[in-house]
């Protein structure tokens, strides 16, 4: 079954449960917008499925690792997208290797995102993630 979620402006977050199958959390906004943080605290309390990204697209680089860990430990999302580097296989693999060793709260699934500039890089990035033990692997839109 296909599930849909839209990144939702703060003013519509309260209504988003009516049109989103799950919640997609951008961690940098948890530090910037009190209303955003409160929405995700309530979503967690209601048992909503939460995927926490690393804010690469929004910031141009993944959010600070210490702040990511803080929010992972506080919200305990269902999934966490480990820090990746836009279209850079090698740097993304380095990050994935590091995060593969980090213990997250029970119930949080780590998701690694394939980043590459060629189909060969994409294939080797994917295989490396598999070899590192990632069970959920996503593909970048780039």
Question: Positions of the model-derived regions?
Answer:
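Non-catalytic, usually N-terminal nucleic-acid engagement modules in DNA/RNA processing proteins
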Residues: 1-102
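Eukaryote-skewed repeat-based solenoidal scaffolds used as protein-protein interaction platforms
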Residues: 72-142
């Amino acid at each position: 079954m296909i599930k849909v979620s839209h990144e939702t402006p703060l003013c519509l977050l309260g209504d988003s449960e009516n049109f989103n199958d799950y919640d997609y959390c951008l961690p940098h906004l948890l530090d910037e917008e009190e209303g955003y943080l409160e929405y995700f605290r309530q979503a967690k309390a209601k048992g909503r499925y939460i995927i926490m990204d690393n804010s690469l697209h929004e910031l141009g680089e993944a959010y600070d690792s210490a702040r990511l860990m803080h929010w992972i430990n506080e919200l305990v999302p269902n999934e966490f997208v480990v820090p990746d580097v836009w279209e850079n296989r090698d740097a993304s693999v380095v990050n994935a290797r590091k995060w593969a060793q980090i213990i997250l709260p029970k119930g949080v699934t780590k998701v690694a995102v394939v980043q590459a500039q060629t189909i060969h890089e994409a294939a080797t990035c994917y295989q490396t993630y598999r070899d590192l033990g990632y069970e959920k692997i996503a593909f970048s839109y780039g």
